Amino acid sequence: MPSFPASPESGGFLFSDFALVSQLKPFRDFRSRNSNERSAMKRIRSMAFAGLFVLSAAHAATITENFTGNPLQNGWQVFGDTNLFQWNSVNQNLAVTWDSSQTNTYFYHPLGTILARDDDFSVAFDLRLNDFVAGIDPQLPSTFPLSVGFLNLAEASQPGFLRGTGYSAPDLAEFSFFPDPGGAWIYGPSLTAVMIDSTGFNYTSGGYDPDSLTTNDIYRVNLNHTASNSNLVMTITRNNEMFVSNGVASLGTNFTDLRVDSISISSYSQAGQDTNDHGGVIYAGSILAHGTVDNFVVTLPPPPVQNLTGAFSNDLWQAQFIGRSNWLYTLERTANFISWTEVSAAASGNGTNLFLQDMTAPRDNGFYRVRAARP
C-alpha cells in the first residue's frame, strides 16, 4: 500500500497537506492539526504542507504499492475511462489496457509534492504484457506509446493534451514502449526514457533502446533522474536478468524546466496526429495492449517544509522551518479554514532555517499554514 515512511533512525515523519499552527491570545497556546483541504493553482503550481515535522535530518519520501489491497482505497485515482484498469485481488496486481482509441486515461497517484529538473527522483515497477498490437487502426498504421511515468495532472487532464502531436504534451518524465507495427514502418520497436519540458517542444536526447518487449515475461523497469548531471537513466531487467543496462536521456541546452506532480500508468489518446502520407509512410500511430503492473517504488526528495515550529516573538506569531532551494514560502492565516490571507512576504528557500512572521496578528484566534510554491 502507498506510504511516506521515514527511515527507522529518523525519529518519525509526518506528511500531509498543510503546515498548520494556531494562535490563541492571551494564553499563547500552540496547537497543530491536519487538514485535507487543497488549493488548486495551476499556473503558480503551488502546494502547502501540514503537520509538525520532527525529523532531525532530511530524508527522501517513498511511495510503494504492491496491490495487496484495493489501490483505489490507498491513494490511487483514475482519470478517464475506468474500464481500462482492474485490480486483481487474487494475483495482487493491476490489470491494464492501453487503448489509444479512447480518451487520455490515467491510473495515477499524487506525489504530494512538485518535482522539477533540480530534483532527484526515481520510479521502479514490474511490467508484464499479455498482448500488444501497434498500428491497429488502419488510418493510424504506425506505432504509438505504452507509457508509465510522471506527469502534471492539471495539464495532462486538459482536452488539448495530445501525446501524439510531438508538441502538445508538456511536463512529462516517463518510460514508453513503442512496438513495431510492421508494414511501411522501417524503424522497428523502441524502449524510451524521455522528459518533455514545460513548453512541450523540448525533449531529452538519448534514452533510446531498439528492443521490443515480449509477452509473458516480467520486466522490472527503473527510471532514475539525477539533478546534478541532468540525466534520466533507464535500466530494465527481464525475468531478473539484465535487459537494458544504461539508457541515458540527457537534458539539452534548450530544455527549460518541468513540473510533475503524479505518478501515472498512462493510456494516451491517438487524437491530433498528422495522418498525411509522407513518402509512403503515415507516421500517425495507434496501439492496443493488455498487461499487468505491480510493485511500484517511487522515491522523492525531502519535503519542502521540514522541522516546522511556531512561537511568539515580541507578541507576533512566527513560524520557523527548514526550506529548500528553488521554492517560495509564504505564511498564511485563517480564522475559519475557508478563506486564507497572506500575512508575510514570499521568502526564497536556501536549505537553512527560514522565519516567517505575521506582522498584523489578530486580536483573538488565528490559524496558520506555510504555503510552499514552485515558481
Regions flagged by a language model, labelled:
Residues 67, 125, 212-249:
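Carbohydrate-binding surfaces in secreted/extracellular proteins
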Residues 185-220:
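Short, aromatic/His-centered strand-loop micro-motif at the edge of beta-sheets
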Residues 63, 71-101:
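Extracellular glycan-recognition surfaces and repeat-rich motifs
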Residues 67, 287, 294-298:
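Extracellular beta-strand elements of beta-rich domains used
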Residues 98-194:
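Secretory/extracellular carbohydrate-interaction modules
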Residues 300-375:
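Short, composition-biased motifs enriched in small/polar/acidic residues
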Residues 56-60:
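Sec/Tat signal peptide C-region and signal peptidase I cleavage site
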Residues 248-288:
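Flexible glycan-contacting loops in extracellular carbohydrate-active proteins
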